[in-house]
């Protein structure tokens, strides 16, 4: 993977004549990292690729709104997380599933996904995460998997650090309770 300097990408994105090149660099630089952010929220490979593609389309169409005040990855992450959450909300509206069936369907979906390389414990963890309310799920995912600092999350999600810490603590507690009840 090529490593491009954030400032170099920003500079290219700011000039109409170099935007395309800057955007190509941006896609090469951040695709994998964004894919995993999306995948942890959306769960399946195919859906994650769709959401990632929508993320880059939105980013390209919204280049004029990017002024370079934040890091490129922060801007892209915000778009990716919003796209992921929108996708999950739409899926919830489509799928009318009882509460008992919803948990096992997450595990079944993951185990059937040819790109899922986890074991049953990982599938159960994903079930537990999927059962969390949206905000707690997002905060847990960003903190646990991406090891994102609360200060970064605060900027990304426009939420206070204290609120994020509380959401993470509650999410961890709920996940622990989930595993205790599924022993």
Feature map (PLM): residue ranges:
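C-terminal edge and immediately downstream basic/flexible tail or linker adjoining helix-turn-helix-like DNA-binding
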Residues: 2-3, 95-98, 124, 152-158, ...
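Internal acidic/polar
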Residues: 2-7, 94-118
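Conserved RNAP core-binding helix
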Residues: 27, 35, 45-62
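Structural recognition of an alpha-helix C-terminal capping motif at a helix-to-coil junction
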Residues: 50-57, 70-82
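Arg/Lys-rich amphipathic alpha helix in sigma70-family domain 2
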Residues: 65-67, 78-98, 170
